[in-house]
């Protein structure tokens, strides 16, 4: 029996809680952290534990300005709990831990473990070492020790899964610290990726999202410029895989073969999230983004020609150093031309260690706020107009879990359309489970969701729904002390603090 196993036997079942901040990469890493801890004998704390678990892990983000304040505020909240509970441990990982390795324990000496983005597999060992040695363990690897997809994973969903195809980023955007923290791009072999997808489908997963910091640069390791489009097409040949998505691509690497693969692969969903960041050529140059407005709008035009019903979303940064009113108007121009379904908008924030932080002509906060509000108002209007075009359409939805905050009160359920729009629909008499597919007619549009208020036209029970039911039944059958039961459909579970775009793609 390992020392970790012995500690669990001696002290009884120990619980854990993982708190996630940042992008989808962190969400997937948190699934691995949960898998590692459960593999080591820990069990998940009940929802709403709020720091009452025996081990609390923070998986942090370093992109936004308030990331530091958020972390240390949460750590301060846990300090009295830890002081009153011998044996409780706190671990900090992710991008902020990679960046602030030397200061976290100084500012919060009650933290037990600090680990980085390259060695998440060490967490159980570091926790045990901190317990035995009774001192903080700070261990940051400078490069990837093993591709994280080899680690055990506790997936949050029984019917949808992330699949990493690469880690790291070779771009040098002046506002972004991620490449310094996640390292250079490293690609997985196509055979390993497809084997993981096939294994997930065998478990009942029917939707996968191919994940990378710059997903369509995939293949740079092997010198194959069309590797990503080939991977998309290969996913189209996997029986039982109904939906394939990917995030996030970079406009520089968005080639015609990728557009063709999206259009011609039956299970590739009509959805594209492609960060814009700015519509101004001078600002894009200062950002070191390696494309210009004409190139970006040209990609949008080609995608819409090949996939007319595609929903296109983006990331935009407002108030980059040196941004003039004319520059900002160019961003508004692109937003009007592209007609994004949604835009994840961010106010520029200085990140120490990035070239942009040292640039002259930092924009006053009041100016940034005013521009931000104008951009949000414009995009809100466009999002609503684009959603109104969906009214009257008949759509197949994959029933989702925890997507609708008011589902229980309104007797509705929620699902995702092929283009990833959120749809709330009337709960049918027939039982439906997350992962099942329903056919509905859209009757109403709001800026951020659609409604299907009539009767459901069809219900298709799926292997994904079977997988959800099997896991839910197994979780509810666990002993009461473990408390791992999943919420029932229609009742939302707390979601990690995640932005669909983090401004770093």
Swiss-Prot record:
Annotated positions binding [4Fe-4S] cluster 2: 169, 173, 176
Domain named TRAM: residues: 388-456
Pfam families (UniProt xref): Radical_SAM, UPF0004
Gene Ontology biological process terms in this record: tRNA methylthiolation
Main location: cytoplasm
Domain Radical SAM core: 155-386
Superkingdom classification of source: Bacteria
Classification via PANTHER family: CDK5 REGULATORY SUBUNIT-ASSOCIATED PROTEIN 1, MITOCHONDRIAL TRNA METHYLTHIOTRANSFERASE CDK5RAP1
Family membership: Belongs to the methylthiotransferase family. MiaB subfamily.
Protein purpose: Catalyzes the methylthiolation of N6-(dimethylallyl)adenosine (i(6)A), leading to the formation of 2-methylthio-N6-(dimethylallyl)adenosine (ms(2)i(6)A) at position 37 in tRNAs that read codons beginning with uridine.
Name under which the protein is recorded: tRNA-2-methylthio-N(6)-dimethylallyladenosine synthase
